[in-house]
Amino acid sequence: MHILMIGLNYKTAPVEIREKFSFQDSELPQALHQLRQMKSILECTIVSTCNRTELYVVADQLHTGRHFTKTFLADWFKLPKDEFTPFLTIRENDHAIEHLFRVVTGLDSMILGETQILGQVRNSFFIAQEEQVTGSIFNHLFKQAITLAKRAHSETDIGQNAVSVSYAAVELGKKIFDDFKGKQVLILGAGKMGELTAKHLHSNGAEQVTVINRTREKAAELAKRFLGVDRPYNELTEAIVEADILISSTGATGYVVTSDMVSHALKKRKGRPLFMVDIAVPRDLDPALASHDDVYLYDIDDLQNIVQTNLEERRTEAEKIELLIEEELVEFKQWLNTLGVVPIITALRTKALTVQGETMESIERKLPNLTEREKKVLRKHTKSIVNQLLRDPITRIKELANAPEREEALDLFTKIFALEEELAEQEKQEKVKQAEQEWLAKKRPITCMEKQSHVMVKS
């Protein structure tokens, strides 16, 4: 058994490539079953976000697993392999497991340590589970990965410091105001950065939002998102009088808010502090504003400096998570190795119980006058002898599962107990079971998610 990750992300592929390889949640059931039906694929999960599309599979062979996973991508997206192969990242076994752990903890994200990816991976896994395309390996692996991510964010401070310009403005504001509740936010311009900053302020308690923009319709549209109000551009000075926080991100080429304008407003504010954030380039707010008492002015460079400092702090926290990942990787490998000896343990039990059964049949033939109670007692005690004899070998083989000489030791164990025939029969039954599952997958009923998707397409 081998674990593979094949995919592309923001590091390896530009957005014009990534957008061609994106799965909608409604497409995942069909995609998962199509991938699972590919030769060599035993289990699978697909993680698809705006920054990555990654296919995780359990394959019986590495080379066929790689080949048929790429074939699935080519078939699904109807693109030749040579068009996307240069952008692919491939991770195998330990490296695939470690990669998943880094992804789910946010260490591989564009914004280091972000938590949104945890929900996205969890959702992808739940869909795969619901579609019954995961098995014992991925059920264990993804549950462990999700638990690791929760542990990483509870045991470290990686998510505590702002690493976006918009959220850095909120951090600065908290140094001036103990609480944003009841504070008036004035957004000057309807730009994306201003909107993001307002969103963070609003989620931190700033409920009263006013938007001013040269195009009134855009101002009204943005104000509506925050249950705020829009005002005409010629009321800017009056709006500054009422504001506690001003966020400016217009596309103007000169200063939109001048020192003289604020001087008039300050006379009516009676010493209330005014927090001003200039996200625009070129700047909207006259740098001379910083000379006024009760005015706290910050521009894009100030915010970038905060972001850079916080990034360094996050990198320090990320090192702690790397240690957690190492621990979890060792733990999963030990579990996986133990899982690998299950067929040998099963074969040993099968052989021992077969001998016990044959012995009981021989006893019953030679002692035909045994009562049912006597037979029951004999079965119980002979089975007890078998279990006692097997206890030490089974304990030892579980220990050998994680020993350096694992392969040689397991091979010797198999030969000593002559388990080749039992293992061959297990393998045969497993192939029959796999063939039945593949046949059932092709005959499977349409899922609720697919029905909803079909209805949406028709409508």
Swiss-Prot record:
NADP(+) binds at G189, A190, G191, K192, M193, G194. Pathway: Porphyrin-containing compound metabolism; protoporphyrin-IX biosynthesis; 5-aminolevulinate from L-glutamyl-tRNA(Glu): step 1/2. It comes from the Bacteria. Substrate binds at T49, C50, N51, R52, S109, E114, T115, Q116, Q120. Its EC number is 1.2.1.70. Gene3D superfamilies: Glutamyl-tRNA reductase, N-terminal domain, NAD(P)-binding Rossmann-like Domain. InterPro entries: 4pyrrol_synth_GluRdtase, 4pyrrol_synth_GluRdtase_dimer, 4pyrrol_synth_GluRdtase_N, GluRdtase_CS, GluRdtase_dimer_dom_sf, GluRdtase_N_sf, NAD(P)-bd_dom_sf, Shikm_DH/Glu-tRNA_Rdtase. SUPFAM superfamilies: Glutamyl tRNA-reductase catalytic, N-terminal domain, Glutamyl tRNA-reductase dimerization domain, NAD(P)-binding Rossmann-fold domains. Keywords: NADP, Oxidoreductase, Porphyrin biosynthesis. The record marks H99 as: Important for activity. It catalyses: (S)-4-amino-5-oxopentanoate + tRNA(Glu) + NADP(+) = L-glutamyl-tRNA(Glu) + NADPH + H(+). It holds the Pfam family Shikimate_DH. The keyword NADP applies. It is an enzyme of class 1 (oxidoreductase). HAMAP family: Glu_tRNA_reductase. During catalysis, the active site Cys acts as a nucleophile attacking the alpha-carbonyl group of tRNA-bound glutamate with the formation of a thioester intermediate between enzyme and glutamate, and the concomitant release of tRNA(Glu). The thioester intermediate is finally reduced by direct hydride transfer from NADPH, to form the product GSA. Belongs to the glutamyl-tRNA reductase family. Catalyzes the NADPH-dependent reduction of glutamyl-tRNA(Glu) to glutamate 1-semialdehyde (GSA). Homodimer. Possesses an unusual extended V-shaped dimeric structure with each monomer consisting of three distinct domains arranged along a curved 'spinal' alpha-helix. The N-terminal catalytic domain specifically recognizes the glutamate moiety of the substrate. The second domain is the NADPH-binding domain, and the third C-terminal domain is responsible for dimerization. This is Glutamyl-tRNA reductase. The gene is hemA.
